[in-house]
């Protein structure tokens, strides 16, 4: 029986969800290990894998002069956004951190409209407004220090929006493997001195969680995402990326005995239903 490209795309998107879910679990399971140390190991694995893939493909890592600032910008925004996302995962429930992180498509749309002059229709504007409403429910704005992790989580989504917008601009100009290579390289270079300033020697279990739980799982998530969009267009498979909100809620309850509060549930419901609404709208536009 022939398996359709869409089915393959959905399969790889769900593999990506599993990878990033396992990564989130590992991040929370290592409270003793500083954030920068976790980010270093996460990107070390991606750097080694991307370098190996480029070597196997005999691909040059040279980037055209006019694209260098954009590759650097993508790497820088991606790195800072990742640090912010790890901080959010450490200090919020997995579900809340991933709800905020999944707002990045909203900021991609806004950035693409401003910088790439892409057109946004009325239904997309409605979707953006609904998503921003969801932010209020998840963050629950106040003057308390307790709101800081939520704001950092939102900041990670904004930076991811910048990063993905640059990736969209570089499409056809720079291969995705080269983007991943330089993003991972910059992250490793930036986190190494910060990690050494406050290095915590991991025990055997923590080494396993850093390399496999965070590094390999994140690579699984990243490559799953890449393959998903290789087999099927974003309009057909992107919606399945939001399954991570549900898997995160389950893992929060099963492993950490925590559940998001009512306001976060409402925010998550708005995010998922708006994502479905935009998915159906975008799919209709492409048909």
What kind of feature is each model-predicted range?
Residues 87, 104-126, 246-265:
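C-terminal transmembrane-helix exit sites in multi-pass transporters
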Residues 34-46, 87-104, 146-159, 204-218, ...:
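Structural signature of hydrophobic alpha-helical transmembrane segments
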């Amino acid at each position: 029986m022939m398996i359709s490209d869409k089915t393959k795309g959905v399969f790889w998107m769900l593999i990506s969800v599993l990878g990033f879910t396992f990564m989130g679990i590992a991040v929370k399971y290592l409270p003793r290990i500083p954030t920068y140390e976790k980010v270093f190991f996460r990107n070390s694995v991606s750097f080694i894998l991307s370098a190996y893939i480029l070597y196997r493909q005999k691909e040059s890592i040279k980037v055209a002069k006019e694209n260098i600032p954009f590759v650097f910008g993508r790497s820088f925004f991606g790195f800072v956004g990742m640090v912010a996302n790890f901080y959010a995962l450490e200090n919020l429930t997995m579900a809340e951190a991933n709800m905020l992180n999944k707002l990045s498509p909203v900021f991609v749309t806004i950035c693409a409209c401003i910088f790439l002059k892409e057109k946004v229709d009325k239904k997309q504007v409605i979707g953006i407004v609904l998503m921003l409403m969801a932010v209020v429910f998840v963050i629950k704005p106040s003057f308390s220090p307790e709101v800081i992790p939520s704001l950092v989580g939102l900041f990670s989504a904004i930076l991811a929006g910048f990063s993905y917008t640059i990736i969209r601009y570089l499409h056809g100009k720079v291969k995705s493997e080269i983007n991943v290579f330089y993003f991972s390289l910059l992250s490793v270079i930036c986190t190494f001195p910060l990690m050494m300033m406050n290095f915590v020697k991991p025990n055997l279990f923590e080494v396993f969680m850093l390399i496999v739980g965070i590094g390999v799982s994140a690579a699984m998530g990243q490559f799953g995402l890449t393959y998903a969009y290789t087999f099927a267009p974003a309009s057909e498979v992107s919606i399945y990326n939001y399954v991570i909100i549900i898997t995160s809620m389950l893992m929060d309850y099963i492993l950490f005995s925590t559940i998001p509060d009512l306001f976060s549930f409402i925010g998550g419901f708005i995010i998922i239903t708006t994502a479905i609404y935009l998915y159906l709208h975008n799919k209709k536009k492409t048909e």
